[in-house]
């Protein structure tokens, strides 16, 4: 922890956070590329909605398995930075291979490989932040690392740039474009970021409110709720990314340019929420932020189903309904890391991120795609409404973990006892 190591200056901590955020931004840029390019890919490869869902789900499956494995390995063995650099180079190569895919099965294979490469990147990044960033800024740092770059690059820049590039040069060249910058960021990380081998913080004493032993940690109620919320949030995210571009073009009859800018509005919203809401949670608490944003998740599917106005009004609906993305780093990283023994943070993060990908990322698009084949493209929006309802029910039971909020509560309690 940086409090014991004076060389981990505030400047280095924010430089570390910015680099990890940029790296994960290109992860989501590559991951989401197929979703935004699907209107171009579908006719050439002859895909139905179930196959579209399968392409999204297969990546989530191997992503989840990698998150489980890397989180555990990073807690017990080896160099976190080395694992991060190798994974980053591998996912860039997989993106390039996606542009060469001649069929559904070939594309399926490249997406499976990409999931293996990408799945461990965020657990590794959050482990580095947990070990090297001051706990007073942990929420916003984890939020920026997970949400800022991924939202800016994966949800805003990706649809605008990739759709424009595919329109001009073809979707295959758009995949080649997606691979290049990730290699540059991986090289910078290799030379700039300091390593935190094994469980560097294993000798640290856990805070008083953190539970002990490994299995007790993973059975801790906050971790269970965070796994459930992670599953629901990833389900909402992946189903929206997978089917909203098709809904906008096939049902609302927007052209490719309008669709790309509307999907880009999600990126702008998530970029802002990644630091505004996580930073706010450092001050007012994690629980209230997660609960309120879960409630606002109703706005996007309901507003889209009822929409009959100009595109800019739908962009406003997207902006409000996407607030839950600001809570994703909290339930997938910050709250779990503050709820378990410091030696088991990697395993807890792997459980949240891996579990969310298997159930939220693998099964959700498959079921939603099959539902859409039988009912129509509005079916995934009904799915989102159900997910929002379940998220609200789970979020209200979270236990507060924000250090500043707990410290204020302890101070108030001491004052009350003296009186």
Language model segments and positions:
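Helix-loop-helix hairpin linking two adjacent transmembrane segments in secondary transporters
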Residues: 145, 149-191
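C-terminal transmembrane helical hairpin of 12-TM major facilitator-type secondary transporters
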Residues: 287-332
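Conserved MFS/SLC helix-loop-helix module at the cytosolic interface between two early adjacent transmembrane helices
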Residues: 65-102, 281-287
């Amino acid at each position: 922890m940086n409090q014991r190591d004076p060389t981990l200056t505030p400047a280095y901590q924010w430089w570390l956070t910015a680099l990890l955020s940029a790296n994960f931004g290109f992860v989501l840029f590559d991951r989401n590329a197929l979703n935004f390019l699907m209107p171009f890919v579908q006719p050439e490869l002859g895909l139905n909605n179930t196959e579209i869902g399968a392409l999204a789900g297969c990546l989530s499956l191997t992503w989840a398995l990698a998150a489980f494995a890397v989180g555990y390995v990073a807690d017990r063995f080896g160099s976190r930075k080395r694992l991060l650099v190798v994974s980053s180079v591998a996912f860039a190569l997989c993106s390039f291979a996606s542009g060469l895919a001649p069929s559904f099965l070939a594309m399926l294979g490249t997406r499976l490989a990409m999931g293996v490469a990408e799945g461990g990147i965020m657990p590794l990044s959050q482990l580095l932040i947990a070990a090297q960033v001051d706990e007073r800024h942990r929420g916003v740092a984890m939020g920026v690392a997970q949400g800022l770059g991924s939202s800016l690059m994966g949800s805003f820049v990706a649809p605008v740039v990739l759709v424009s590039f595919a329109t001009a040069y073809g979707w295959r060249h758009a995949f080649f474009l997606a691979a290049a910058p990730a290699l540059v960021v991986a090289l910078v990380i290799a030379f700039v970021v300091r390593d935190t081998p094994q469980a560097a913080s294993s000798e640290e004493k856990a805070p008083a409110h953190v539970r002990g032993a490994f299995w007790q940690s993973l059975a801790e109620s906050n971790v269970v709720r965070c796994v459930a919320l992670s599953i629901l949030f990833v389900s909402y995210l992946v189903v929206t990314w997978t089917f909203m571009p098709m809904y906008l073009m096939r049902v609302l009859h927007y052209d490719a340019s309008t669709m790309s800018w509307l999907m880009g509005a999600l990126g702008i919203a998530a970029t802002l929420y990644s630091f505004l809401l996580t930073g706010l949670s450092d001050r007012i608490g994690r629980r209230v932020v997660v609960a309120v944003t879960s409630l606002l998740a109703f706005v996007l599917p309901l507003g889209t189903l009822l929409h009959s106005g100009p595109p800019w009004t739908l962009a406003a609906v997207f902006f409000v309904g996407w607030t839950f993305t600001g809570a994703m780093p909290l339930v997938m990283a910050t709250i779990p890391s503050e709820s378990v023994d410091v030696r088991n943070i990697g395993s807890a993060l792997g459980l949240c991120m891996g579990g969310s990908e298997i159930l939220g990322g693998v099964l959700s698009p498959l079921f939603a795609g099959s539902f859409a084949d039988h009912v129509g493209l509005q079916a995934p929006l009904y799915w989102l409404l159900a997910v929002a309802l379940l998220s609200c029910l789970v979020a209200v039971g979270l236990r507060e973990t924000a250090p500043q909020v707990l410290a204020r509560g302890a101070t108030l309690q001491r004052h009350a006892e003296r009186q």
